[in-house]
């Protein structure tokens, strides 16, 4: 099984790598599941120069900016459609100003991929659309882990 780790990057501390690294290790050790980590994939898809500068190109070099963003969007959505079995998403303040996580969850829902949403915001501050795309919601990663263990213990 392969989990896609969705959540804020653009506005998140360390691009959201801390929680992804923790759940990645847990999934491998406890379920022998692999992950698609967009933080790691981005390092392979874009050059260090592109990663460092693409946001500065919004106004200065809009076509160059669009080319980079299209590369990111195409890659992420293709991985969700063609490679991921399910999605784990941390929904926190870092996703509010972004758009990628919203699109990823919508795409996963459209292609009938289970979406496990870990809320780090009050549920009444969470988009109805996002809740509708979710298979299950959790208020912490420990409850998610218990659920995943129960789902996969007989497999």
Which residues make up each language-model segment?
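Conserved catalytic or regulatory cores that recognize and/or transform ribose-phosphate-containing ligands
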Residues: 1-155
């Amino acid at each position: 099984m392969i989990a896609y780790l969705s959540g804020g990057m653009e506005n998140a501390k360390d691009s959201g790598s801390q929680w992804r690294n923790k759940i990645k290790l847990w999934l491998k050790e406890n379920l022998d599941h692999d992950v698609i980590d967009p933080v790691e994939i981005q390092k392979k898809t874009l050059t260090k120069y592109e990663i460092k500068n693409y946001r500065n190109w919004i106004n200065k070099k809009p076509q160059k900016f669009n080319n980079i963003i299209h590369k990111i969007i195409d890659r992420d959505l293709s991985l969700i459609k063609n490679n991921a079995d399910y999605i784990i998403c941390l929904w926190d303040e870092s996703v509010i100003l972004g758009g990628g996580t919203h699109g990823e969850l919508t795409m996963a829902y459209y292609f009938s991929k289970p979406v496990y949403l870990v809320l780090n915001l009050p549920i009444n501050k969470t988009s109805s659309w996002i809740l509708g795309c979710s298979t299950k919601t959790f208020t912490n990663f420990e409850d998610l882990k218990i659920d995943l263990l129960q789902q996969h213990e007989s497999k």
